């Protein structure tokens, strides 16, 4: 049967092509007068970029929307494949449409139980690539769609089935999606979920990727918060993530035996990471708040670490006193160190004001937290 959704189907075929390419970029951009094709593929040696022009994007939405209305008014000529392509069009253009999202998920469930429901070769492999590539797109609404991130979790669960030869490339997705959009909460919150449910060897890989990302993106508070969580997991949140994973395996009838050793495996002891982070802050003269907040969050959930932090606190306090003696008092506005005007053209001193200012803020918050807990006890 010829597709009634040529744009939606072509988009699906384009975005799920090159299955062996992990570095696949989806870009939505303004029309280019020199290009008349609805989609443009920029093929490089090690990466692929699929470019969708604005006119195509709007036409694709109109095509999916028209077909959506038809499915409710006239059921004749409706095929599961066309419904699937319609939902793909909506996942691109309006990913938070819950009605369409539910239709899409229902089709996946039915297909997983009976492959004849959708006559699309290698559908689950293509579905995983589709969602991964949407999550790595240049479009903020797609990249930060909570519905797509939840669907990605479900596809991971489906991929665990013994009959499914597909494995989501989670490391590339988190790095690419996190790099595309600064402080992507849904991306790094999903990373927490994966971290709590991955086998220990994959957990190590995710932890190392997150740590590298943070050290390379010092201002990204969402990734630093995820890193703090991985180092010192909150038991309640961890339990919620594990229960959600178990709920999904049950929902999709995926047999999966929990490995308690995996669940309780700690990638890097909190004290070892804390020492590494403190050395990194000192060595790089970190002049942004997220690394300090990460350190603060880790000590919040580990009483032993607070005692071991005494020598660090003393060293930092002396550094701050020496700096203020030579350069003047560090003033803060809305928890941000202010560089005096006379040093505004002095890059080194300006960085030092930020560096020692955030150390001072850390000390104040650390001590305030301890005082509050002592008064509450």
From Swiss-Prot:
Domain of life: Eukaryota
Gene: ECM9
SUPFAM superfamilies assigned to the protein according to its UniProt record, in alphabetical order: Protein prenylyltransferase (SSF48439)
Note: Present with 846 molecules/cell in log phase SD medium.
Protein name: Protein ECM9
Keywords: Cell wall biogenesis/degradation
GO biological process: cell wall organization; endoplasmic reticulum to Golgi vesicle-mediated transport
Family matches, as Gene3D superfamilies: Protein prenylyltransferase
Function of the protein: May be involved in cell wall organization and biogenesis.
